[in-house]
Amino acid sequence: MGLYGDQFKDKVAIVTGAGGGIGQVYAESLAREGAAVVVADINVEGAQKVADGIKGEGGNALAVRVDVSDPDSAKEMAAQTLAEFGGIDYLVNNAAIFGGMKLDFLVSVDWDYYKKFMSVNMDGALLCTRAVYRKMAKRGGGAIVNQSSTAAWLYSNFYGLAKVGINGLTQQLATELGGQNIRINAIAPGPIDTEANRTTTPQEMVADIVKGIPLSRMGEPEDLVGMCLFLLSDQAKWITCQIFNVDGGQIFRS
């Protein structure tokens, strides 16, 4: 029995960007709590490996290929989930372009790259929510967690802009869907030690960032799990429209 007892038993969760990194850890944690998990990723081989690992530990998982920037692909993800598990209770919008991201200024970034980047990193959360919310409502409601970032409060060019958009999207959708008992919140991690981060952020920049964090270290993907599970759980049943920093104290607001 997991931390939340049998609360997640017989529930169905979709985690996008779950073929590795933070999304993988979210998917594995939900499976350990008893949820059936759809491991959704544009890299279907990575998703299948994660799903196989979950099933190897006695969990229930399905790998699904999804391009979150494509409305039809998001709808197909929802359809495959319904066909396999019969419903949808939770969605974690984690998919993003980050590893290998082109660092550039807003005034000079290639326009086609910018549009693709925003279609995944911001619009993807909207398209996946649109694909699943009616299915959640049919089950009496549900919960959605969006992945934001402390980059929303720092200068981070178009990556930070996308996360500002995620924060606004979280609050607007939570307001629209609250009447259907669908709660939507966001987690804003600080710098997390993942392969994607190691290939994108120069290490001297990482060292400077860590100097400004009260807990004096980068986060680990596992540091985000507690907040994700809490926000999906019934313990958070009166919490919606909120952005929660999980960042070692990097950003503090009064």
Name each model-derived stretch.
Residues 107-126, 141, 145, 166:
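Catalytic Tyr-X3-Lys loop
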Residues 6-38:
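Canonical Rossmann dinucleotide-binding motif of NAD(H)/NADP(H)-dependent dehydrogenases/reductases
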Residues 11, 59-60, 87-88, 123, ...:
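Active-site loop of short-chain dehydrogenase/reductase
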Residues 102-106, 110-115, 158, 209:
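Substrate-binding pocket helix/loop in short-chain dehydrogenase/reductase
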Residues 134, 175-179, 237:
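Alpha-helical segment proximal to the catalytic Tyr-Lys
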Residues 2-4, 98, 102-103, 154, ...:
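Short C-terminal tail/terminal secondary-structure segment
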Residues 129, 162-165, 170:
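Active-site helix of classical SDR
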Residues 44-45, 65-77, 111, 222-223:
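The beta1-alpha1 cofactor-binding region of Rossmann-like NAD(H)/NADP(H)-dependent oxidoreductases
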